[in-house]
Design a protein with these regions (language model features):
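Non-transmembrane functional regions of envelope-associated proteins
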Residues: 2, 11-291
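Short, Gly/Ser/Thr-enriched beta-strand-loop segments that form substrate-interacting elements
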Residues: 294
């Protein structure tokens, strides 16, 4: 009888320990889930440092041949062409040269939001007090915007637009983007990053561009830019990120198909050959949080 009672006590003790272990495990899961949802700065900073370390220890290999060429505005360019900003006629010539070289998409991460002060009609006002006759001749010449717009019409050009928090009375915004979106899932559009206002290129330029893409990026808490929006709401419109729009134009895809839910984007499809998935918080990290599949 004594042995039987001892065994019963052992069974009860084992059961109590088992329930205690389960409660501790459940508590840890709830705490970790709360931390993940809260995402305090300390945790985010640690995650960012880990990401940077992964970039250094296992960077994406650079291919021997890349389909992307960067035309940089560097010191050599400034020494040859002159100080910034350059006349729009320079960009018109650049577009023509790139188009003739066979570029399937010519992408500018520059905002052409204001009129070119070096355009002949605009420059005429500065010469008026000096030589009215020369000023009158300059007003008869086409503007640099017209030259650039003509080049944009000839080739597939993507221009940038910025999302901002305050309206700018002197700058254009709200131009209808060429990209169309098809939404698969409820609440995806509402979950996108939002900017109340936008600043885009002049209508003469934006109206002739094959694409408009968002150039705005939001730094992390340490001030480093590691991610770029894949798409965002700018005012009442939805704009793709500049890289997404460049790929859309290059593949001649009219509609971007976005699947997901109120928690975010699950996948973004540009064409049967291009699917972009594994997005985190609607933003693509530079290396580790996106992939292209074919």
């Amino acid at each position: 009888a004594r042995a039987k009672g001892t065994g019963s006590q052992v069974d009860r003790s084992a059961g109590a320990v088992d329930w205690l272990t389960r409660l501790i495990g459940l508590g840890l899961v709830l705490v970790l889930a709360a931390i993940q949802m809260w995402d305090p700065p300390l945790i985010e900073a640690a995650r960012l440092r880990l990401f940077d370390q992964l970039q250094r220890s296992a960077p994406r290999p650079i291919p021997d041949q890349s389909p992307v060429a960067i035309v940089d505005i560097d010191d050599a360019s400034l020494a040859e062409i002159g100080q910034w900003p350059w006349p729009r006629s320079v960009f018109a010539d650049l577009i023509d040269r790139l188009g003739e070289a066979g570029a399937v998409a010519i992408v500018f991460d520059i905002l052409f939001a204001e009129a070119d002060r070096l355009s002949p009609p605009a420059y005429a006002q500065f010469l008026e007090p000096i030589d009215a006759r020369v000023a009158a001749l300059l007003r008869t010449l086409p503007s640099n915007e017209e030259a650039m717009a003509a080049a944009i019409r000839r080739y597939p050009v993507v221009l940038g637009e910025a999302g901002i928090g305050a309206a700018q009375a002197k700058l254009d915004g709200g131009f209808a983007p060429p990209a169309r979106f098809a939404w698969l899932g409820q609440g995806v559009e509402e979950a996108l990053p939002a900017f109340p206002y936008g600043v885009t290129a002049l209508p003469a330029l934006a109206g002739n561009a094959r694409g408009l893409g968002l150039v705005t990026v939001v730094p992390e808490l340490d001030g480093v830019v590691r991610r770029a929006p894949t798409a965002a709401r700018v005012g009442s419109r939805v704009l793709p990120g500049l890289a997404i729009e460049a790929l859309r134009v290059a593949t001649d895809t009219p509609t971007i198909i976005v699947a997901g839910d109120a928690a975010g984007i699950g996948s973004l499809n540009l064409a049967p050959r291009f699917a972009i998935n594994r997005y985190v918080q609607l933003r693509a990290s530079i290396t580790f949080n996106y992939e292209f599949t074919s």
